C-alpha cells in the first residue's frame, strides 16, 4: 500500500519538470497510465508508455522487479532509474547529449528499493537506426559517434548498451538513450567497458559497411 512504503522523488528542474501532479497520478496508477497513453513496450522487466500532457509528450519507463530472486539480486544496488539520472548528469557535464529526465520516482519496500520510474521528455529528431535506414548523412553520424566515445574515455565511463536503437540524431547532435546500465568504470570494468560498447555499436551497424569502416578506425 502507498501509505506503508517510503517513496523518493527527484525533479531535475522545478521550472522545467512539467505537470508533476499529473505525472505522479499516472505513476501511482499503472492501469490509468496505460489507458491514457500509448504502450511502447510491456515486458516482465519494464514498461514503457508514451503520454501527452499539456502539449508535451513524455515517456514513462517503469523498471519492474521481476521476482523474489531478481529483487534480492538488486537489494544493495541503486535502482535503474536512479542510475539513468546519474548517468545523464555525467554525460551532460562533459558536453554530451542525453534524453532529458523530467522526474525519477523510486518505490522503497521493507528490504530496499523496488520498482522505479524514469520520466523523460520526447526528443526531437530521429532514432539512429531509423536514420541509417533512411540514408542519413554518414559523415555527421561518424563525427557524432566518434566524439561521444572520445568523451566517454575522458571520464572512464560506459554507456552499457551502445546500439543504434539507443541513440537519437537531432541536427548534428547524437543523443544517448537508455542509460540505466551506464556507469563510471571501476578497476574491474575499466578493461572492457568502452570496448564492449564499441563492439555493440559496430555490431548494430554491420549492414552499413561504409559507416562501419569509418567508425572502426575512430572509436
Residue ranges and their predicted role:
Residues 3, 80-84, 194:
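Short, conserved glycine- and acidic-residue-centered signature motifs
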Residues 174-219:
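C-lobe/activation-segment region of protein kinase-like
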Residues 1-11, 129:
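Single conserved hydrophobic/aromatic residue that forms the stacking wall/gate
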Residues 69-74, 130-134, 187-189:
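Short acidic, glycine/proline-rich loop/turn micro-motifs
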Residues 48-51, 59, 149-185:
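Active-site acidic catalytic loop and adjacent metal/ATP-binding pocket
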Residues 25-126, 150, 154:
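Conserved ATP-binding subdomain of kinase catalytic cores across diverse folds
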Residues 81-82, 87-98, 129-165, 174:
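Conserved kinase catalytic-core helix
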